[in-house]
């Protein structure tokens, strides 16, 4: 009987001690996760009871080593410095709560990796920098900062040995352009994309990787016209060139013409000395012509009597012999055939001008004609 009572009391004491120990035990952190990007890796967790005397400690373990962090009161911690060979390893993260001298059990582990071929809960990817788009020669020019320079201090690019390989897909994957960007050669990565047709908006998708580290796809669009238009200067410069050439040639021709004309003026007089000799009539000033009337002396003078009636009465009484004498005297004064000759000469020359003498006149050197007019003094 006493033995049974002793056993019952012992079991009761043990149960009480167990309940006291469970009440004193520190609870473990919950919902452990990892957030990783191009700049680093951060572990996060949750804790049901937050006290000022509670600290947390993060443990990172890879396939070869295990590292513990310093204690922190925050519910997150940057663990980038605790990663070794992030390009190939995968990491297991656990968090332990510490209060006083007591530690909680480790939390559930969380596995992550930057290696796209590793088996992990989460695979960390890199992000492309901001992309600059501009039209160039009828194509869409794509340019962005080289990630090998931009992320050179991040854990993802630690112990780097590979180059960046990226591809641009257009027209819903129908066209694809791939390029390589190196750290030593390029401060920026750039290429040109060709589109099958012209449109108001040009979109494409950018993907890439550095070894086994992959980049998150990035989509970009350019709104505008990328077609190439010939600048105005392409037509202006040839036209100016042709115009200046023609002006230059024209100037040379004018100078040569002036020179030839001056030389010809010097040589022609010596080659043709009498070419410009038009005779004395052309070399002297014209003379003034003076008209001199011929003196005509009357051979017969008739005196009027005082009474015309008396004179007329005397005429019929005059003797015919006297009239014949007068007629013969007047006829003898002109000569026997003077009137006949003058009349015949005038008719033969088709010009009835007995009062204008006929003379020779020189119209040009060596060319003389018959003319009628006053005599030259």
UniProtKB/Swiss-Prot annotation:
Subcellular location: Cell membrane
Tissue specificity annotation: Highly expressed in spleen. Also detected in brain, kidney, gill, intestine and heart. Expressed at very low levels in muscle. In immune cell populations, shows highest expression in monocytes, and slightly lower expression in peripheral blood leukocytes, splenocytes, neutrophils and mature macrophages.
Name assigned to this protein: Interferon gamma receptor 1
Extracellular side: 24-235
Keyword Cytoplasm: no
Fibronectin type-III domain span: 26-117
Keyword set, alphabetical order: Cell membrane, Glycoprotein, Membrane, Receptor, Signal, Transmembrane, Transmembrane helix
Residues listed as glycosylation sites in the UniProt record: 78, 186
Source taxon at top rank: Eukaryota
Transmembrane segments: 236-256
Signal peptide: 1-23
Induction details: Up-regulated in response to ifng1 (interferon gamma 1), tgfb1b (TGF-beta), and tnfb (TNF-alpha 2).
Pfam families (alphabetical): Tissue_fac (PF01108)
Function per UniProt: Receptor which shows binding specificity for the cytokine ifng1r (interferon gamma-related).
Gene Ontology cellular component terms for the protein in this record: plasma membrane
Protein's UniProt keywords contain Glycoprotein: yes
Region of interest: Disordered: 326-377
Topology of the protein relative to the lipid bilayer: Single-pass type I membrane protein
Protein family (similarity comment): Belongs to the type II cytokine receptor family.
Positions in the Cytoplasmic compartment: 257-377
GO molecular function (one): cytokine receptor activity
């Amino acid at each position: 009987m006493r033995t049974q009572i002793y056993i019952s009391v012992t079991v009761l004491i043990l149960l009480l001690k167990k309940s006291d120990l469970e009440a004193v035990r520190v609870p473990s952190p919950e919902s452990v996760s990892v957030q990783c990007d191009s700049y680093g890796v951060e572990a996060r967790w949750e804790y049901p009871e937050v006290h000022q005397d509670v600290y947390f400690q993060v443990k990172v373990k890879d396939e070869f080593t295990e590292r513990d962090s310093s204690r922190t009161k925050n519910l997150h911690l940057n663990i980038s410095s605790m990663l070794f060979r992030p390009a190939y390893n995968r990491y297991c993260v656990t968090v332990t709560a510490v209060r006083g001298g007591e530690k909680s059990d480790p939390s559930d582990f969380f596995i992550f990796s930057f290696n796209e071929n590793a088996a992990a809960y989460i695979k960390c990817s890199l992000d492309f920098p901001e992309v600059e788009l501009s039209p160039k020669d009828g194509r869409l020019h794509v340019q962005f900062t080289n990630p090998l320079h931009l992320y050179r201090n991040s854990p993802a690019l630690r112990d780097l040995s590979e180059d960046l390989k990226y591809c641009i897909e257009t027209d819903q994957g129908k066209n694809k352009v791939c390029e390589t960007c190196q750290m030593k050669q390029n401060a920026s990565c750039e290429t040109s994309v060709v589109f099958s047709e012209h449109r108001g908006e040009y979109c494409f998708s950018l993907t890439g990787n550095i070894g086994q580290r992959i980049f998150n796809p990035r989509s970009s669009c350019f709104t505008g016209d990328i077609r190439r238009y010939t600048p105005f200067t392409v037509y202006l410069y040839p036209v100016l060139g042709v115009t200046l050439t023609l002006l230059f040639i024209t100037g040379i021709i004018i100078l040569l013409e002036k020179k030839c004309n001056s030389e010809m003026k010097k040589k022609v007089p010596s080659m043709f000395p009498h070419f410009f000799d038009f005779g004395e009539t052309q070399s002297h000033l014209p003379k003034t012509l003076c008209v001199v009337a011929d003196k005509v002396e009357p051979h017969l003078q008739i005196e009027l009597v005082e009474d015309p009636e008396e004179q007329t009465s005397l005429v019929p009484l005059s003797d015919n012999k006297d009239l014949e004498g007068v007629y013969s005297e007047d006829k003898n004064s002109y000569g026997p055939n003077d009137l006949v000759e003058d009349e015949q000469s005038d008719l033969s020359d088709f010009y009835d001008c007995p009062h204008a003498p006929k003379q020779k006149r020189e119209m040009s050197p060596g060319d003389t004609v018959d003319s009628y007019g006053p005599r030259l003094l």
